[in-house]
Design a protein with these regions (language model features):
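Short, solvent-exposed turn/loop segments enriched in Gly/Ser/Thr/Pro and often Arg
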Residues: 49-52, 90-96, 181-183, 295-304
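An active-site-proximal structural segment forming one wall of the substrate-binding cleft
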Residues: 27-29, 35-46, 61-92, 96-138, ...
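Active-site region of glycoside hydrolase catalytic domains
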Residues: 2-5, 112-237, 245-268, 289-295
Length: 334
């Protein structure tokens, strides 16, 4: 029997993405009760996807509205108060976002000016928060790079990461940095192992199951009714073994001394609930077997455990929350 490889460079953080400043159209207010609830139930990690447009003025990436940083300060302070590790992520940074609701004026992968502005923003964060230890705060540089070769190649990504890591380390050498894999976070980057920074995978495959009827994806209306096992992806029917093989590629990083975390996973609320839970348990078994922690996409909302508006769930009123009890218990189990 082959030895199971486990990552041991990061804690097995377990938690949620909280979407305070993720999109101009869908940011959430700061709710201290959410942090307390998450902590009280044994979770220890919050990923905060950020959109740089919140803190610039006049569409000028060098004109900074420092008042907005007070909200980020509050997020970090709540993390410290409730013993939750805070992972700050640029979901939109200068030159790139996987969310195409707004067209960036330049390309992070291709334009040096975009890269200069991008690293400048991370230097602002590095300077402002350099007194906060990495045990409490980490930086996740850019969310889910992807695109055609004329938008973002693997070589472009390596250039962006090396340049930005050096920029941050020049100010805060000890800061914990986590980078997403390429191709929407699904493919690891062993070529960056020498930087000794952690890497973040995703839990969204097969996409036909996790994003069934997702209203921002035109093709999602054409996906077959999900089932598990047996959901299709890339001309293959997925089951536990196919999923395991996918993450085996990731855990090879552990043998290179690289920490691994799953920064996002989840299932949109149109997938049948029993299918979502069955798939989710197989994912959590896979991740846990390698000591890889996780963060559900959304505490609240269509992927989350609170107010997810699933038509096939009877919600439990629990401590003032409308809880998807079965999904919540599944997360608690792992």
């Amino acid at each position: 029997m082959s030895k199971i490889i486990v990552q041991d460079k990061l804690p097995r953080w377990r938690g949620f993405n909280i979407l305070h400043m993720f999109s101009k159209s869908s940011n959430e207010p700061l709710r201290e009760d959410d942090y307390k609830f998450i902590s009280d139930h044994g979770f220890d990690f919050i990923r905060v996807p950020l959109n740089y447009l919140f803190w610039i003025l006049n569409n000028n990436p060098r004109d900074i509205n420092w008042d907005i940083f007070k909200k980020i300060d509050d997020i970090i302070n709540l993390g410290i108060k409730y013993k939750l590790h805070i992972n700050l992520n640029f979901h939109r940074g200068p030159g790139f976002s996987v969310n195409r609701e707004i067209q960036e004026p330049y390309s992070l992968g291709k334009d040096q000016k975009a890269l200069d502005d991008f690293s400048y923003h991370w230097q602002l964060f590095a300077e402002r928060y350099k007194q906060i230890p990495s045990k409490q705060l980490s930086f996740n540089l850019i969310n889910e790079t992807a695109g055609t070769p004329d938008e973002f190649t693997r070589e472009d990504y390596e250039k962006v990461i090396r340049f930005t890591v050096n920029s941050i380390k020049s100010i805060d050498p000890e800061r914990l940095i986590i980078i997403d894999g390429i191709n929407y976070g699904n493919i690891p980057c062993p070529e960056l192992a020498d930087l000794k920074i952690a890497q973040s995978c995703r839990g969204y495959l097969p996409i036909t199951l996790t994003h069934y009827k997702a209203n921002w994806m035109k093709e999602a209306e054409l996906y077959p009714i999900p089932k598990w096992p047996g959901a299709p992806h890339n001309e293959k029917l997925w089951d536990y073994e196919v999923m395991k093989n996918h993450y085996d590629d990731w855990v090879k990083l552990a043998d290179m001394g690289i920490g691994i975390h799953c920064g996002e996973f989840g299932v949109f609320n149109k997938t049948p609930h029993n299918v979502a839970l069955s798939w989710m348990e197989d994912l959590l078994i896979n991740l846990t077997s390698h000591n890889i922690g996780f963060a559900l996409w959304g505490f609240r909302g269509a992927f989350g455990i609170v107010d997810s508006n699933r038509s096939d769930v009877v919600y439990e009123k629990y401590l003032g929350y409308n809880i998807d009890r079965k999904m919540f218990d599944l997360l608690l189990k792992y």
